[in-house]
């Protein structure tokens, strides 16, 4: 079992990573140790994940003397919305839950982001715990306190920075994850190697097969390394005013794909993969990376069974309309996270539109 701490002074919290953590109530017991007897806990999940894991969590909570209840939400990116947020608020208000309630987000990135935002808003903030069940949420969205819902005009535009009290990652959950969802998570894993750790990227090139075979040692190492990197970055820049923006490699292009094609038609990680190729090509056109480095990025995404092409139905204008709504835009200027090598990246603001267009069009011919 691996244990990592996100160091944020009085808001620091642990990340526990290992196989079979759901079977051991000790992890929840440690987190809830300072709570009241008969502590009220709400587990929020979706209709796909709840039948697999909710009963285990509820049983553990009951063993600990908690008064636990379950809210099941619809499954899918399209439900990461204000309508579903209101459904959560109605459940909490109708249940007369007080400010000392603990909320557990049991699911993937949609559940984690939505439940985190609801926890930030309910009575101006209640404690919540992340129990991510997809690879993407385990390596990225459950760590760092970004919470949000989508708006038809943009992804994650309504949200808050709100840290969990703990993150519990059981790698056994990945055995029930469809391969397409697993691959979407691998896109975020690869991202960490590109922006921060060239040696980790090298390791991924050699070990993708082990990850897809759900090799426990390889999975634990990869997830822990991603969480270590994210914890280091978040500790330096919690509110994304500097280095944390590098974690958005591929996301400016990728969010445009998700918004234009409809949330859920491309999985988030699929859009990030395509967006990362466009960002890498932008870097190549600007002379920031070599042809060999560009090829390595494209090849690892292909090896991971991820899309590297630009969606045929999206024009340059479609991309720019959405990208100019990106949260990194400052004073009307588009800023892109661009790799400057394998293991490094920068936020760069002065990319000419003709280069961006060339990068987008490059993906049409791959």
From Swiss-Prot:
It holds the Pfam family DHQ_synthase. Keywords: Amino-acid biosynthesis, Aromatic amino acid biosynthesis, Cobalt, Cytoplasm, Lyase, Metal-binding, NAD, Nucleotide-binding, Zinc. Its cofactor is Co(2+); Zn(2+); NAD(+). GO terms for molecular function: 3-dehydroquinate synthase activity; metal ion binding; nucleotide binding. The keyword Ribonucleoprotein does not apply. GO terms for biological process: amino acid biosynthetic process; aromatic amino acid family biosynthetic process; chorismate biosynthetic process. NAD(+) binds at residues 75-80, 109-113, 133-134, 146, 155, 173-176. Binds 1 divalent metal cation per subunit. Can use either Co(2+) or Zn(2+). It comes from the Bacteria. It is an enzyme of class 4 (lyase). Its EC number is 4.2.3.4. Pathway: Metabolic intermediate biosynthesis; chorismate biosynthesis; chorismate from D-erythrose 4-phosphate and phosphoenolpyruvate: step 2/7. Catalyzes the conversion of 3-deoxy-D-arabino-heptulosonate 7-phosphate (DAHP) to dehydroquinate (DHQ). Belongs to the sugar phosphate cyclases superfamily. Dehydroquinate synthase family. This is 3-dehydroquinate synthase. It comes from Vibrio campbellii (strain ATCC BAA-1116). The lineage of its organism: Bacteria, Pseudomonadati, Pseudomonadota, Gammaproteobacteria, Vibrionales.
